């Protein structure tokens, strides 16, 4: 195990179909694997604020689809938008909903949170957002510590007017957000430093 504060042990379960079949049909048998590996910070620089870009041309999932399922088919389409964002100097992409193109859904493969007037906001689970374990843990931890948490539709406009923001996931843990850019508009948080509530939850 990595020393406390310097890394984590990442556990990744993998289930894949196998057997003598080539067509599009359920596999007759399955293989279950578990990868275990020590890891460092998901984003370069460790627990430092990251800059994100809102994608206005790509969507991670659509209503009625499998966006709420942890499957490779939900990650592969995001590789191109992520690569484009990184080539422009951003750490990752923020995806908006495919229906109204106004509400934040996810940050690459991480869940999104923002803080306004001491209240913690996160996009509600609508079937297009992955119900992350870290997301669930943070919501419970925040409420246990007397922090109000609201699960709702979070518009990009609202998020960009928030006091602080961060994303979270099994690999990302908690990554503070320093700025969000949408088109020609850029919102900055805490002068590039992790916010008070973000730090407390971390």
Where in the sequence are the language-model features?
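Helix-start/capping segments and mature chain N-termini
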Residues: 1, 14-17, 21-202
